[in-house]
């Protein structure tokens, strides 16, 4: 009875501290071997969950891997604020239409940007008027229905992350990249991913972040921070999912190696964990901690959590020796 009371007290204490990741102190006290064991469990859980998400998209895409990649690409480029809007855009402008217009970059840009419904929010210069005219023709050709502008979140968005600018970057990536699936499966390092996505936009966007608003000329290539996020949330996830699909352990290992050789994400959640010490050094570490945060801490699932169970086991042993 006393042991049960002690167990309950430990669990209640863990749950009370879950919202501010109180078990970070325990993680920081572990040696590298034991912390790696925990990260491996959590990291694989996250990869498997994302694998299931990708396979659901694969089914939605009629078992078409290039279309699946295209949907995950747009979803990832949308970031936290606009991932659902970008995913819907990928449904409305299918990859097959992109391939058919591959030799005409401005047509691809017209389809993607025109289908957002966002052009109506901005003044029209000659370039934007041409995009609109092209979209009217291409939307009839491919039966594309534009989204509502209200589906997009534009407030508190940095200029570099504006949906229209991101779509101009996606356009040049799709135009310049042949055999897309092969190229992403080949990536082994963060530099490989940077080279793959670091293509310059069409000239108009060098002096624009949004339509018709002229700025000084600045390169709009995807930067290293964004390319690392693409490596983490797109490239490695597709490598792991496709490797699982074709039962290629080497491809799954490539995904893991890439995660281990990219720096950890920088966000408020990881910063909170790192306040206990350098808990996230690589992207694999930070992905493991995100799994811990959102699947366990957020829902107070301490009894089911690998960290919570170890703390409970340690506390139980200490009680028994008293």
Q: How would you describe each model-predicted region?
A:
Residues 275-322:
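Acidic, carboxylate-rich catalytic segments that either coordinate divalent cations
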